[in-house]
């Protein structure tokens, strides 16, 4: 099938390879996913090389040795660039992962490594919190990452049974966290897990009290915002003459005009845009609450420009897609920060202190609405806050408004 993609001796080796059918199936999958021909060609040549490596050692698939694969990749990537090394590792992974139909998993990031002894404990716990506490899938992944890290620490300390965990282990792990934010996050995760495990009779109910509870102050940091002129500059600097630019502009406009969270922009679907009624009707990822927004002309123009002349052809209903094969939605771990950072770089704000992700637009919009006199309830409705208490934090930035209601020193002295 791919004979004309090889030349000379390699063409004959490909035709006689015991893995030819495997290469044909996965190569066809890459064609269907619209990978660039040059990328497919690189993969095919690496698959042939790896196939020869297997034949020389009398190895068959899927029974391959992990150490052998690591040694092979170590030799292949020893004198190559970082980008070339990534391609080689991806080629081998795809070749090994593919099934009889040429389908393979697209790996995004490295999954957390859960120690063998802890896996049978973690699985029922995650099932419990997802079933009885309504834990979102993304939060469950964070729980997995944190608890697996704790289990790895325990294993390193020679502990592979829950009933051998001591308060000293908990405190040492907690204190090794890099800063206060991870500590608080790990602390709450561990306390919930310890309470559940104690209910199963696997450890003492007092262990959760060993997790430190540092004093926490609300509103310690001011929300980070841009000036309106800066917002306009960021949007105006996007090159909308390209499909990628039209996509990025639509993402930025949604964040700037509605203050939408990155997760809600990432998972916006075509079905949630009501063109006839001129509104966007979505369900928020973070809290599951519905949010209805008017489809502003500027937003409608940005979306239609992207959808009609920019979005890759796809049957997927998610609005925003990656513009490299396989042209799929962004991964759930992707908060679209690269789009915002590139936009800030174009106007010389790449090194600004503070936030540089899409949340910067969300905070800016909230503060601006407050400055023009919008009530907290109205702002909370626009931002999709479940409580105005969350919105209240933005009052600390609206200095002019606070100044108008400030009590003078003379009034205090009286």
Residue positions per predicted region:
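Conserved catalytic core of the tyrosine transesterase superfamily
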Residues: 1-414
């Amino acid at each position: 099938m791919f004979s004309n993609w090889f030349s000379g001796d390699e063409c004959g080796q490909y035709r006689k390879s015991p893995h030819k059918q495997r290469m044909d199936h996965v190569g066809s999958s890459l064609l269907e996913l619209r990978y660039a021909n040059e990328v497919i060609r690189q993969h095919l040549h690496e698959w042939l090389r790896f196939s020869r490596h297997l034949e020389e050692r009398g190895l068959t698939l899927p029974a391959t040795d992990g150490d052998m694969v690591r040694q092979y990749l170590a030799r292949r990537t020893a004198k190559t660039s970082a980008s070339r090394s990534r391609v080689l590792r991806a080629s081998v992974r795809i070749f090994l992962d593919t099934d009889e139909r040429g389908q393979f998993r697209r790996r995004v990031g490295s999954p957390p490594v859960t120690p063998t002894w802890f896996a049978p404990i973690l699985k029922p716990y995650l099932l419990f919190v997802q079933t009885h506490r309504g834990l979102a899938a993304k939060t469950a992944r964070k729980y997995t990452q944190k608890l697996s890290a704790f289990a790895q620490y325990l294993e390193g300390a020679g502990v592979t049974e829950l009933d051998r965990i001591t308060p000293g282990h908990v405190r040492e792990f907690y204190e090794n966290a890099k800063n206060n934010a991870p500590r608080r996050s790990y602390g709450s995760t561990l306390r919930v897990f310890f309470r559940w495990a104690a209910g199963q009779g696997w450890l003492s109910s007092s262990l959760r009290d060993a997790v430190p509870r540092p004093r926490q102050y609300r509103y310690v940091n001011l929300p980070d915002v841009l000036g309106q002129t800066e917002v306009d500059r960021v949007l105006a600097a996007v090159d909308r003459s390209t499909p990628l630019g039209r996509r990025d502009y639509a993402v930025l406009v949604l964040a700037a005009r509605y203050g939408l969270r990155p997760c809600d922009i990432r998972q916006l679907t075509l079905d949630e845009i009501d063109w006839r009624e001129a509104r966007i009707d979505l369900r928020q990822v973070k809290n599951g609450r519905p949010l209805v927004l008017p489809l502003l002309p500027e937003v409608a123009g940005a979306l239609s420009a992207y959808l009609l002349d920019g979005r890759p052809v796809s049957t997927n209903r998610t609005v925003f897609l990656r513009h490299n094969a396989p042209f799929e939605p962004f991964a759930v771990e992707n908060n679209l920060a690269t789009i915002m950072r590139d936009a800030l770089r174009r106007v010389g704000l790449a090194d600004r202190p503070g936030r540089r992700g899409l949340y910067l637009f969300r905070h800016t919009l909230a503060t601006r609405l407050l400055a023009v006199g919008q009530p907290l309830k109205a702002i909370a409705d626009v931002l999709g806050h479940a409580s105005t208490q969350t919105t209240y934090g933005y009052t600390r930035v609206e200095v002019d408004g606070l100044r108008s209601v400030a009590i003078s020193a003379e009034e205090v002295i009286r």
